[in-house]
């Protein structure tokens, strides 16, 4: 009701129903895209970038890949990494694959940075996959992106022949901390 009282939506129930319906229609495409991206990420370290507005989604993708595929992944945001981290592409120590989460509502300056950054990555032969976040409303775009990230992490685990469910190292850490 807070969302409705603020005038952001007519009714929270309506937006949830609309989001649920749209996600149902997108399910197959999300699954397929997740599998395809997982194949591209196999053997590489994913670095996920987004605008500050979507930073929580970048972090979610990173933690899902860490936990489910049992491999490193990192994240950062436009424009912060443009001040220093971008220099690391001149001398990359590792096999990286950049994933950019891109929302149509991102600020025009962020969009410009993304375009320039993709061009620079091409000059340094760093693979990049841009994920255009789509949906009729912010909630749909949010859930679509979370869902796709989960499919990427799950399928990346399968690519590595790893069971994504156990978290043995976390359990060991917790046990030793007692």
Which ranges hold each PLM region?
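A SIS-like phosphosugar-recognition module
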Residues: 1-178
């Amino acid at each position: 009701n807070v969302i409705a009282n603020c005038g952001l939506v007519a009714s929270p129930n309506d937006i949830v129903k609309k989001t649920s319906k749209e996600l149902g229609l997108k399910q197959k495409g999300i699954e397929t895209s997740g599998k395809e991206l997982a194949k591209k990420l196999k053997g590489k370290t994913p670095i996920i970038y987004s605008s500050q507005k979507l930073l929580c989604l970048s972090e979610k993708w990173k933690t899902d890949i860490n936990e489910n595929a049992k491999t490193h992944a990192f994240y950062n945001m436009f424009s912060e990494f443009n001040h220093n981290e971008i220099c690391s592409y001149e001398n990359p120590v590792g096999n990286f694959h950049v994933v950019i989460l891109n929302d149509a509502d991102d600020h025009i300056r962020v969009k410009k940075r993304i375009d320039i950054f993709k061009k620079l990555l091409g000059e340094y032969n760093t693979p990049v996959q841009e994920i255009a976040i789509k949906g009729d409303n912010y909630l749909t775009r949010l859930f679509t992106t979370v869902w796709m990230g989960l499919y990427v992490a799950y399928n990346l685990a399968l690519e590595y022949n790893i069971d994504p469910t156990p978290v043995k190292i976390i359990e060991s850490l917790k046990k030793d901390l007692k």
